[in-house]
Regions:
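ABC family nucleotide-binding domain
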Residues: 1-160
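H-loop (His-switch) and adjacent beta-strand-loop-beta switch element
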Residues: 157-170
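ABC ATPase nucleotide-binding domains
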Residues: 172-175
Length: 175
């Protein structure tokens, strides 16, 4: 979480100013799930281990975190790929593993940076349907994208130009 010069920034009632790196990492791990455009999977860990990683940092036992990771892989349609390494997966499969990893710690907010940027159109629709389903279950989702079809699948579109909000409009709310 970045520092700031003016104003007040809170996360779930916690003032985010002068936090230690450890406390900031704890808050990030508990409150925010990240989906990266480049997936950021750990190359020497299989799908289950990649998905289970946030739970490791929360002190969850290996047996429990691996069982939960399998559930989340099943949720994204990849249970059969649990033991596969990232280099054995397609871009869409890697992205779904990354989504499962972002969701497993049950964060309150998901920050998704170009979550469909590396995907074909069919997989883009599948990923957006999954994100929409999770959003409808009550999870706040912030998606950064340059793809008009992805933006329009959201409830609200905030267009930013040169670091400033240019417009706020209603999205279609479906893929």
């Amino acid at each position: 979480m970045d520092t700031y010069d003016t104003g007040i920034y809170t996360l779930n009632g916690q003032l985010i100013r002068n936090l230690s790196e450890t406390r900031a990492a704890e808050l990030r791990n508990r409150m925010i799930g990240f989906i990266f455009q480049s997936f950021n999977l750990i190359s020497f860990k299989n799908a289950v281990e990649n998905v289970a990683l946030p739970l490791y940092y929360q002190g969850v036992s290996r047996k429990k975190r691996n069982a939960m990771a399998l559930e989340y892989l099943d949720m994204v349609g990849l249970k059969d790929w649990a033991e596969h390494m990232p280099n054995e997966m397609s871009g869409g499969q890697k992205q779904r593993v990354a989504i499962a990893r972002a969701l497993i710690a049950k964060p309150q907010v998901i920050l998704a940076d170009e979550p469909t940027g590396a995907l074909d159109s069919k997989t883009t629709v599948e990923v957006m349907e999954l994100l929409r389903r999770v959003n409808l279950e009550g999870l706040t989702m912030v998606i950064v994208t340059h793809e008009p079809s992805v933006a329009e699948a959201t409830d609200r579109i905030i267009r930013v130009k040169d670091g400033l909000v240019e417009t706020i409009e209603k999205g279609l709310g479906h893929v």
